Amino acid sequence: MDDIILIAVPEEAPAIMLWDNVFFTGIGKINATYTATHLLHHYKPKRVWNFGTAGGVTLSPGFYEVGSVVQTDMWLPALGLTRGKTPQDLCPEIISLDSNGVICGTADEFVEDPENLAEYCDIVDME
């Protein structure tokens, strides 16, 4: 299988949910990571597509290609760390992909005040 498509829940893409290369991860970063890791080892795809619903922070509704991701629920200012930086983590605060697309903030929580995230990301998701 050259391509796999990851979607959190069937309601996000009912038109393609029966394709044989579509897999549902469940909601949240841990569920998405676990499912993606399993599928990568099993199918060894050339490309992985993450498709789903995201909330707008600085952008209006539409279709966007993600160019970078940041963990918006990781924020420890008391330790002098910027949003997205995990202590002793080797990953950068912002992980850049092979695209010039928008910045997606990901978290395992719903966003109550998008204005607090406007300097960090354009859209938000939970996977």
What are these regions (language model features)?
Residues 11-126:
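Glycine-rich phosphate- or other oxyanion-binding loops that anchor nucleotides, phosphorylated ligands
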Residues 1-5:
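Extreme N-terminal starter segment of soluble prokaryotic enzymes
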Residues 8:
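Internal glycine-rich, Lys/Arg-flanked active-site/core loops of soluble domains
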